[in-house]
């Protein structure tokens, strides 16, 4: 399994399984001198961790991160940063009944066919539990981006099932368990999730993440375009089935006269492109949306097969999120931060001294 690392100059490698002893990450390429502590990482981990509300899995993991290396006297040294989170609330017995069958809609079948075996406890390596380390590593990138470049990254749930945010209040995002920016829809969300829980079912969601104050020039055409790497990062998150940059699939119904982001001496007149032109950041807000499927771990009976190919029926046991999109918000923020951090370092390496007389637009 070679796909455990992400990034080039700012590179993150993760390890660990859902019900293993621990999860870990090695972060390479962080510039020296950045003030960082476990508390800086813990904030985002607390936003992602399970058991924080009745709308997420009841598995209770403190997700307390330990910095093992790469930080001395409160500052990064420029060497590899080692991170570790211990698993403390595994209930592997919940999965003993399904070790010989495949959960439909999960990675059980494909992992088994590819590797000839699989860790059936909570999905093993394929579990979203692994994303805790991405969030921890992303918190390092987020602090550097904000402290050195003033870049702010904000994620939120823009849609849960049929309920869409029709208003945007940034102050609301961290004030409710849905990371939802529209206070007028919170009661409807609560009732919808209550009904869903009674059904024993799950639902999909849409998450949006915005990066502000991104400098113009990030992105390495043609194969490492900024939007291509962002899409790669977001599609690497569990349950993500679609990614949009800017207006995304809505451009199908737009005319060129409508879609083009006209330029004036005062700046861009619109941002249909989502802050990226020709694979390079334009200096506008980078706007990314992703669609997450409903988890197949539900108590509604479903058809499947055993490892021997025999037909059977199953009801999922264990502790699961009825909407995985809720806890995906800090994960999406982290992945966008990792991409921007990597591209900032790559841009600096090749284009540090490039100057133009053209004004930079916003």
Curated annotation (Swiss-Prot):
The keyword Secreted does not apply. NADP(+) binds at residues 48, 54. GO terms for biological process: amino acid biosynthetic process; aromatic amino acid family biosynthetic process; chorismate biosynthetic process. Residues 39-59 are annotated as: Disordered. Belongs to the chorismate synthase family. This reaction introduces a second double bond into the aromatic ring system. Homotetramer. PANTHER family: CHORISMATE SYNTHASE. This is Chorismate synthase.
